[in-house]
Design a protein with these regions (language model features):
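Short-chain dehydrogenase/reductase
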Residues: 97, 147-155, 191-199, 203, ...
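A general boundary/transition motif marking the beginning of the first structured unit of a protein
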Residues: 112, 192-197, 298, 317
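C-terminal substrate-binding subdomain of Rossmann-fold SDR/epimerase-dehydratase oxidoreductases
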Residues: 201-342
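Short, contiguous strand/loop micro-motifs
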Residues: 2-4, 94-95, 148, 192-193, ...
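Generic alpha-helical secondary structure signal
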Residues: 39-42, 63, 94, 199, ...
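Catalytic core of nucleotidyl cyclases, primarily class III adenylyl/guanylyl cyclases
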Residues: 187-189
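Short, basic/glycine-rich phosphate-binding loops at helix/coil junctions
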Residues: 183-185, 222-223
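N-terminal Rossmann-like NAD(P)+-binding domain of SDR-like oxidoreductases, especially those catalyzing
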Residues: 1-184
Length: 342
């Protein structure tokens, strides 16, 4: 089977590309390299022994995207390509709606115009739920008005995909609503490349641990949680990429037409910021320098997944530990430091 991976050199995309190749899929990667690096392509080859076809393309360039589809027949598409900074989206909402929504619309239009049976996996987010009234969050939780343009872009993209599939029997699709992916490949050849000040907690932790940051700032300790810090559902990147492949395999066996559904992807366990820091310290035998700062605008109190739907429907389960994820994240940070020193 031939699979197109958009944003395939990014954090989740690169790990999924490795998993697909190892599973015997033929893949083509497209990426505009805004939040990734071409060196990732070489490292995918080092891990798998195979260099996938790659095209530097911005999905907003519809003509360039059409060329890829003219020269390939894809059985499936996994769509990661998107900007993902919540704070940046608040400062520049037009960029996020253009980049994320327009890109998805172009991709769906071209897939639809080909008239070929295509299975689509969309990289969505638990941000569509906002601060859910009930925890853990299941898929019947309402999709709310979004506080950030990033969240709004994910919500709109899901709607675009669903509306197209309802009327097009040639496309089946699944949106995967991730919680908080962490960790890196065990080879330390690919991982999360945080540009500037990290928005995600784990790169902030590892950069503080290695000395790139003077200290780690915890954004608030006065939340109504067991230790006053925010609660999130952290999932090992290894488990997340297996969810994509499992979803793709599920669709490939699907006899129905016009099939669309969405699934939470998490562990089902909520961990506070302070608990995650303690696990990192214990796992890697490191003491972190951290202090309590003010709350960060837009942060919700708690979010963790009810995963029964994906467990029962697709047969996917999270299996890897948070400790292992934090160990691989730390090894990745040390590898990055060596590369920078050289």
């Amino acid at each position: 089977m031939k699979i197109l991976v958009t944003g395939g050199l990014g954090f989740i995309g690169s790990h999924t590309s490795v998993e697909l190749i190892n599973k015997g899929y033929e893949i083509t990667i497209i990426d505009n390299l805004v939040n990734s690096n071409i060196s990732v392509l070489k490292n995918i080859e080092k891990i798998t022994g195979f260099r996938p076809e790659f095209h530097k393309i911005d999905l907003r360039n519809k003509n360039e995207l059409k060329k890829i589809f003219r020269s390939n027949i894809f059985n499936g598409v996994i769509h990661f390509a998107a900007l993902k900074s919540v704070s940046e989206s608040v400062k520049n909402p037009e960029l996020y709606l253009s980049n994320n929504v327009e890109a998805t619309k172009n991709l769906i239009d071209i897939i639809s115009s080909k008239g070929k049976k295509t299975n689509l996996i969309f990289s969505s987010s638990c941000t569509v739920y906002g601060q859910a009234e009930k925890l853990p969050i299941n898929e019947s939780s309402p999709v709310v008005n979004q506080e950030s343009p990033y969240g709004e872009s994910k919500k709109i993209c899901e709607e675009i995909i669903r509306n197209e599939i309802i009327t097009n029997k040639n496309i089946n699709g699944i949106s995967l609503r991730y919680f908080n992916p962490i960790g890196a490949h065990e080879s330390s050849l690919i991982g999360e490349l945080a540009k500037g000040i990290p928005e995600n907690l784990v790169p902030y932790i590892t950069q503080s641990a290695i000395g790139k940051r003077k200290e780690l700032i915890i954004f608030g300790n006065d939340y109504p949680t067991r230790d006053g810090t925010c609660i999130r559902d952290y999932i090992h990147i290894k488990d997340l990429v297996k969810a994509h492949v499992s979803a793709l395999e599920f669709l490939s066996k699907m006899k129905k037409e016009n099939f669309y559904d969405f699934f939470n992807v998490g562990t089902g366990k909520g961990i506070t910021v302070l608990e995650l820091i303690k696990i990192f310290e214990d796992t890697n035998n490191i003491k972190l320098n951290y202090k309590i700062g003010n709350r960060r605008a837009g942060d919700i109190i708690a979010a963790y997944a009810d995963t029964k739907k994906i467990n029962n429907t697709i047969g996917w389960y999270a299996k890897n530990t948070i400790s292992d994820a934090l160990k691989t994240a730390w090894n990745w940070e040390k590898q990055l430091s060596k590369l920078n020193d050289n």
